[in-house]
Amino acid sequence: MADITLDEAKKEASLLRNQLDKWADAYYSKDAPEVEDNVYDQKYSRLLELEKQFPEIVTPDSITQRVGGEIDSDFTKVEHAIPMLSMGDVFSKDELKDFDQRMQKLVGHPVEYNVELKIDGLSLSLEYENGKLMRASTRGNGYVGEDVTANARYIADIPQTLPEPLTIEVRGECYMGKEAFAKLNEERENEGLSVFANPRNAAAGSLRQLDPKVTKKRQLSTFIYTWVNPPEDITSQHEAIKRMQELGFHTNETGQKLASLEEIFAFIDEYTARRDSLAYGIDGIVLKIDDLNIERSLGNTVKVPRWEIAYKFPPEEQETIVRDIVWTVGRTGVVTPTAVMDPVQLAGTTVARASLHNPDYLNEKDVRLGDTVKLHKAGDIIPEISEVVLSKRPVDSVPYVIPENCPSCGHKLVHLQDEVALRCINPSCPAQVEEGITHFASRPAMNIAGLGPKIVKQLIANDLVHNVADLYHLSAEDLAQLDHFKEKSINNLLTAIDNSKKNSVELLITGLGIDHVGAKAARLIAQKFKNLAKIMSLGVQDLASIDTIGMTIAESMTTYFAQPEAQEMIADLEKSGLNMEYLGEDEPEDIPDNPFKDKTVVLTGKLEHYTRSEFTKRLQALGAKVTGSVSKKTNYVIYGQDAGSKYNKAEQLGIPLLTEEEAIAQIK
């Protein structure tokens, strides 16, 4: 550390504490991190250096003296009988070697480690009494967490009852897999909601929901890795993990008992290379002394256990050059900048574009054409510019000028109150019309097969459609004007458009593209009020009275339906013969242990109690996806009499088989 005076150290430490407190609060309490982990870690390490050199500047409230963030939420507070401490971090193999030497010196001999993957999620404690799950809680500040028991009951791999009547506490990590994360963000995009930046944020936001039904839909998972105060006959970490597996807990099977640094470094190298191919996010490797008696003798500091350490992966970054900044117009008029760059390989994929989100973000980063930038993937998934390499900025560089006019229609762009986004508010903007019609025809909405973005673009270019109602006035002669459209393509598209008239009204509401109103909100509203005429007559309070709808959606819907243009278009749709009624089933009674929620199910054989169509609808109402073929992704096969090849294939693949009666018994 460079020479620094006591006064300078005090001043710098104070600034660092304030900044770190702000970042920690955003990360732990709001699930909305403001900086990447490596930036936080660098600042935290600097504060530790200062406090080590000048012990007199350490304050009791310094973030180095506590765990996590302060608790500020609507959840019941839970005091941890044994603190849930965080881990010390190292960022190089040399530091890991120093840790090993320190352990050997403290213990007096070489030690064996249980080496595990560091899962990128949030810490979770599970407490059982007489084998029954009684409480689940988050880490919080390490001493006081939040009671999330109601939500934890909807995480599929958390056992609600143990095979033995034990009173125990186990701890682990709650996470969201990459596939579930991608699915959730796709759903949120379709519903006009902001997407999560990474799986860790998504997991934290999903577990800390006031409505457990939201958690239930989010497909969270756990890895359990700690047994708090295990029985005396369990003397090591790996024995504890094996026993927890036997009790039904989901543990990570990649962990290994290793004795030498060479083996540990090989493990690190292996998973540094494999991390992109894993189904879940990891941000490092954890070393724990395997012998529990040694762990107990070493104990903890005020903040971290002495006997374990986390090796953090360095962020994978690539440098590339910004060649252009393009602006795209979404269906709601939001205009978004995207950096177009020289292609680079990053975390297993080729990346040539990264969102710049909004004008404030672009200006804050000060990204310019010709800049060399550092690119990484937030949460190993979303390409993001981390910084501009100023030393490589061209000498003739000039600040980027935010456009004043819409790139599609030339209309003046505006900032609406309380929004950082730029918007085009021209309802006839070709880009918005194109996006709106494409959305209307998409699978979550009216599901008009064959009507994709390229066809929509041609329809607009040929002046055949100006809004979604015009789709229902198209003729074979109109479609014959499109490129590569022959008789078969024309007939198929006209049939698909005609079939969409029969859709239940919630699909029409989804397709209208009303701000903040996605498929879920549309279904809830249609279930409640049954037809579009009734819905259009409602006030804000009527709509907001529906559980999970809220004022934002209610105000957006009433504003939309108050527009004369919207009323005219809906009247045109009704005149064209579109169904305006809710045709679905009422929301079924919630079944706490519903085994078919978010599962893929196949029906085979002759059923006795239901027709195939009736049972399919029943399963879909319970949240199942019913498909016609058996694959490795199938979760259950329900069979009746004379079951054939599907039954045999399920047996070969080891997929659970249920008789019709067994399936019915589980959903009564």
UniProtKB/Swiss-Prot annotation:
The EC number(s) this enzyme carries: 6.5.1.2
Catalysed reaction equations from the record: NAD(+) + (deoxyribonucleotide)n-3'-hydroxyl + 5'-phospho-(deoxyribonucleotide)m = (deoxyribonucleotide)n+m + AMP + beta-nicotinamide D-nucleotide
GO BP term, example: DNA repair
Family matches, as PROSITE patterns: BRCT (PS50172), DNA_LIGASE_N1 (PS01055), DNA_LIGASE_N2 (PS01056)
Cofactor(s) required, per the database record: Mg(2+); Mn(2+)
A single MF term (Gene Ontology): DNA ligase (NAD+) activity
UniProt-listed Pfam families: BRCT, DNA_ligase_aden, DNA_ligase_OB, DNA_ligase_ZBD, HHH_2, HHH_5
EC category name: ligase
Keyword Methyltransferase: no
GO cellular component: cytosol
Active site: 118 (n6-amp-lysine intermediate)
Positions that bind NAD(+): 37-41, 86-87, 116, 139, 173, 288, 312
Keyword annotations: DNA damage, DNA repair, DNA replication, Ligase, Magnesium, Manganese, Metal-binding, NAD, Zinc
Domain BRCT: 591-668
Described purpose of this protein according to its UniProt entry: DNA ligase that catalyzes the formation of phosphodiester linkages between 5'-phosphoryl and 3'-hydroxyl groups in double-stranded DNA using NAD as a coenzyme and as the energy source for the reaction. It is essential for DNA replication and repair of damaged DNA.
Family: Belongs to the NAD-dependent DNA ligase family. LigA subfamily.
Protein name: DNA ligase
Gene giving rise to this polypeptide: ligA
